[in-house]
């Protein structure tokens, strides 16, 4: 659990590998003054590689019937990727950021845009110019970090297959939030646009669950549906106080009756002690 660990284990690992830094944020600066320059650490020593190594080391001593909650931090700001992932994709091949007309703007948009800017997505570039070139470069780094994550998930899947556990293992891949990446001139996650809250959810069911693989569900779902889905697939009773609904019927191609027609996403724009940028903007 890298988030609860706050990178302490990885920081210790880097120190043991003779990486020089006083504070952890320094390791997230690229090696020179280009935002898409490689990270100071190698791909073998990245936080993504470190967590995967730790997971595989731990799984080798686990008896069957284990459960692993593997929280990869990247891709997440600050955006910096080790070679070769920093230059794996070309900025000029990135999708162009979406724009919004003045007439379609919401009153929350102006303070939201100021809450996080492109310079806040990287370390060491406080005077970073806000422009399409910057957006494309950061997007290319982000996609490179996804490619790195994909490679390490592949390591986990290969190990599961080599140990003949892949078929019987339930695998759930999702994220707690998305990233705006310059869409509508917004950065970070504190927004109501799809880029911030429309996150992926991929489920690889155990072989014993009969259904068609590769199904794409078009119906609405929420992150709170993940827990009841896992419990349902494992044959464990779902407590009455669980808010979500099991997605298991969809895996069996049986859409539940009266399935939800709407979902809820929540962003806390306020703070009772220190006024947020939104509270200050609207005088709340």
Briefly describe each language-model feature range:
Residues 1-43, 83:
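Catalytic-site neighborhoods of secreted/periplasmic enzymes
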Residues 27-70, 81, 124-125, 133-144:
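Catalytic-adjacent loop/helix segments of enzymes that bind and process anionic phosphate/sulfate esters
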Residues 67-74, 170-175, 202-203, 246, ...:
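Short beta-strand segments
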Residues 44, 107, 139-147, 191-197, ...:
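A short beta-strand-to-alpha-helix junction
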Residues 9-13, 177-183, 227, 232-284:
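C-terminal cap/loop subdomain of S1 sulfatases and analogous C-terminal strand-loop tails that border
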Residues 72-77, 94, 129, 134, ...:
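Short, solvent-exposed loop/turn segments at secondary-structure junctions
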Residues 78-81, 159-213, 222, 272-274:
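Histidine-centered active-site microenvironments of extracellular/periplasmic hydrolases
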Residues 2-14, 45-103, 149, 161-170:
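Active-site regions of oxyanion-processing enzymes, predominantly non-cytosolic
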């Amino acid at each position: 659990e890298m988030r609860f660990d706050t990178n302490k284990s990885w920081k210790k690992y880097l120190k043991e590998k003779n990486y020089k830094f006083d504070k952890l944020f320094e390791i997230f600066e690229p090696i020179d003054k280009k935002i898409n320059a490689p990270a100071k650490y190698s791909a073998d020593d990245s936080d993504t590689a470190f967590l995967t190594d730790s997971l595989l080391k731990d799984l080798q001593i686990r008896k069957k019937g284990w459960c692993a909650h593997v929280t990869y931090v990247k891709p997440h700001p600050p955006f910096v990727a080790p070679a070769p992932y920093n230059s794996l994709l070309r900025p000029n091949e990135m999708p162009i950021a979406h724009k919004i007309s003045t007439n379609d703007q919401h009153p929350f948009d102006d303070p939201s845009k100021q809450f996080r800017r492109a310079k806040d997505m990287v370390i060491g570039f406080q005077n970073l110019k806000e422009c399409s070139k910057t957006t494309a470069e950061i997007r290319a780094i982000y996609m490179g970090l996804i490619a790195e994550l994909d490679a390490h998930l592949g390591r986990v899947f290969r190990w599961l297959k080599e140990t003949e556990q892949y078929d019987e293992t339930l695998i759930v891949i999702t994220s707690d939030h998305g990233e705006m990446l310059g869409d509508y001139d917004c950065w970070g996650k504190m927004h109501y646009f799809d880029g911030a809250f429309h996150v992926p959810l991929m489920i690889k069911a155990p072989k014993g669950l009969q259904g068609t693989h590769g199904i794409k569900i078009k119906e609405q779902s929420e992150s709170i549906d993940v827990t009841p889905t896992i419990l349902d697939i494992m044959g464990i009773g779902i407590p009455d106080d669980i808010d979500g609904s099991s997605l298991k019927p969809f895996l069996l191609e049986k859409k539940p009756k009266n399935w939800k027609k709407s979902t809820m996403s929540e962003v806390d724009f306020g703070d009772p002690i220190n006024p947020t940028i939104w509270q200050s903007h609207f005088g709340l």
